[in-house]
Every structure is written in structure tokens, then in C-alpha cells.
Amino acid sequence: VKSNEKSQTPTTPSIPHIMAVNYQCTKLVKEGMENVWKRHKEMGDCARAWAKDRFGLFCEEQYASNTLTTVKNTRGIVVGDVIKAVQQKHNTAFGNGYKDLKEKTFRIAHMGDITIDEVKELLGWIDAELK
């Protein structure tokens, strides 16, 4: 109550988090939210097209997200080995499924600061590991 009367916070605020949020909000405003949504859709469309061509989609397309694509491992690859190889060679990670889906699916994120070129690059690296 006393700190509120002095227009102060009751505890020390997390300044790095405040600065990070400010930085990201500034970037979003500069790019424009319509452009952000368009970029995420383009990346999602790209990832889903790649997945359908090489594997399959885990969810029905009507439930597809423009932030993450879950790929159904229809080829029976060892997902963990591909993830490890891409991470070691390119310092980039993508994730496999959880629990029962660990080797049955893998996930490709396409949101935030990622660009369409980076999504295409990751998909190319995965393709290279599949040969």
C-alpha cells in the first residue's frame, strides 16, 4: 500500500523483461500486425505444403495453425536422429512429438521473428538428412 501511494512497485520489477517486451512491441508496430499475420500464414502454408508432399499432416487442415505445424511421420524415420543431425550441423532445433507421439510426429515452429527463408532453409536441411 505504501509503495502504491508513492507510485512505486511493491517489488523490484524485472527490467530485462520489460525492455524485451518493449523491443518486441516496437518491432511488431513497425512491421504492422497485418504483415505479421500474413508472414505467419505464408510460413505455415510453406511448412504444411512441405509436410503434405513428404509425410503427412498430423491434424486435419481445418485445425492447422500458422504458428506450428505437426508433421505425421508416415515414412517411419527415426525423428530423434534427424533432429540431432540438424541441430549439430546447423545449430537449429525442431521438436519431436510428446510421449506416445515422440517418433510418430515432429513439430516445425514458424512464428515470432522467423522468416520464410529460414523456414525453407530448415526444410531443406531436413530433406538433406532424409537422403
Where are these regions (language model features)?
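Hydrophobic alpha-helical scaffolding
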Residues: 11-14, 72, 112
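Surface-exposed helix-capping loop/turn segments at secondary-structure junctions
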Residues: 30-34, 53-60
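Small/polar glycine-rich anion-binding or flexible loop at a beta-alpha turn
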Residues: 62-69, 99-107
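A common structural junction motif
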Residues: 86-94, 127-131
